[in-house]
Amino acid sequence: MKRTDALLLGAAMVCGAGFLVSLDRLWPVADLPTSTDARALEGMALEHQSAVGQDLGGWSEESQLVVDEPALSWLERTRSRRETQDLLSELPVYLHEIQFKKAGNPGAVTFWIHPSQGLVGWNRATEDDEPGARLDSTSARLAVLAAVRAHIGQDLSGWELRRREVRHLDSRDDQTFVFQRAAAPGSDVEEQMTVWLAGASVREVRPSVVVPPAWIRQGRRRQFLEQFVQAMAFTIFASMGVAAFLYKLVSVRRGLVGFKIPAIGAGLVVFCLGASRFLREPRLFELWDPLGPRWMSAARTLLQGAIGDLLPALMVFCFVAASDALDQEAPRHRGIALRNFLRLRWNSVGVGHASLRGFLLGWVAGGVLALATWGMSRVPGALVELQPRGFFFYGLNSSHPTLLLALFFFQISLVEELGYRHFAGNAILRLGLGRWAAACLPALVYGAVHCGESFLPPADPWWARIVPITLVGILWGWAFIRWDALTVVLSHWACDLFLFNRTRILSDDPWTRLSAVGCIAIPLLPAAVAIAWRAWERLRKRPDPEPWGEDSDLAGFDPGTEPVLATTPGPDDPTEESRA
């Protein structure tokens, strides 16, 4: 083992241990059973199908976890973590949403189930021309109180009626009642129950938490600078894509750029995004209008999404093509392993090394993230928010979470690392600005792009999110300079999988925990292929053309790259003596 690899292994063990013990500080999780089995949720919903006056036998259903994020953010910023956790076990902030639909029937049925309390609400879509009764206010209120008491066990007679609305239709009257009460005597937290009566039938009971309008306005004011900085950073990243496109055009005229590998990279992005969208079954189900074919609705959603997917795919195409051209004019080709990876030549030594180093580097990145977040959490007013939020729901709301998380975060790592490191890092080295500039300048943009992602720690102050992500970007920048592009792509992928399997690892289901561990280990698959291939070749007593202990792919050109050009070493490129 080389000295640098031994140091990487040691750093990964230390940083990984620090990362694991600090997960509760980095991403504290709501103390609720958020990963309830879908069949159990369906059974709970079917027990109350009489509430919607509909036999749901033969209906299709999907379930997903939803969160009232404004309510959660307000609770966290106005009381202690322990108080917030206690309130989450009582208030409708995290809810399981179970939706039923039947082809040809326009009336979708939805149930809301609290992870700890059971059924807390329901809805049955009702057309305006459906006939019904016209009740007076007293009869309507009695019907509402009886339905809520029968199915939820909640006595609304002790709640304050804040609003009543009547909507006169041709064939019935619709009435809406809004009740409120304090969550506890003397508490400033108020629960709200909105009940919709269609004729004489209670068609919706929707609980919520009342968030003070003044707090919402204050949050909107705070977001202006945050959103401006993020927009500027995204503009710079998009400009990098334009620069890569222009350099690609120049390189095509000089015969430096092929189209096969860039096309594979772009196609991979489109495939990963499309497959990720397809695997989010509850979202596809939610968008389905049951008056039309379900397959046609899903196909339309996927096709519409593919239009937006073309932009990141085009950027990857340009990043790969421009970076290959830059590599050909440099004495060290940092894209060979990436090219072999995209061509599925995983038996290559370079791919195997990048897989192992990338996985270890992912643990180091987790340690850097943990240490930086701890430092930022000491800033006055700092807050690390409860999870799950944002991308965490991708894994929680899919029947194939391992596959979805692997595909979705692979395309993210591909787009970002090819842009920030493979293209921008190569370009800065080409301009002779030095290694520090190549590692740090793209990392600053990378950190600013993520300043608006509130699920990243710390949530407050917003600018504190830039520091941990920037430091991780600098780490990956130096890893790119020391090793190659594939190493940082796989490291980014591994780090994301560590983070966003967090809630699945805490599941009570052992199979869910096992699949989460398997998902985290997916970036090691290329290394497993390379090692297994070498073991097979040894059993067949064949000579190994690429000794495992050598980094031959870092010392020269990709044999598949044409034409082979004479190169002049730059001031920041290592010499043969320094590599030895």
Language-model segment annotations:
Residues 291-292, 328-354, 427-429, 539-573:
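Membrane-interfacial, low-structure loops and terminal tails that flank and connect transmembrane helices
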Residues 578-580:
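Intracellular C-terminal tails of type I single-pass membrane proteins
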Residues 23-31, 371-378, 534-539:
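Hydrophobic alpha-helical transmembrane segments in integral membrane proteins
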Residues 7-21:
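Hydrophobic membrane-insertion alpha-helices, especially the h-region
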Residues 218-409, 413-418:
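Core alpha-helical transmembrane segments of integral membrane proteins
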Residues 4-9, 254-269, 330-331, 435-439, ...:
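Membrane-interfacial loop-to-transmembrane alpha-helix junctions, especially the N-terminal start
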Residues 16, 26-234:
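Soluble extramembrane regions of membrane proteins in the secretory/endomembrane system
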Residues 382-547:
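Transmembrane helix-loop-helix hairpins at the membrane interface
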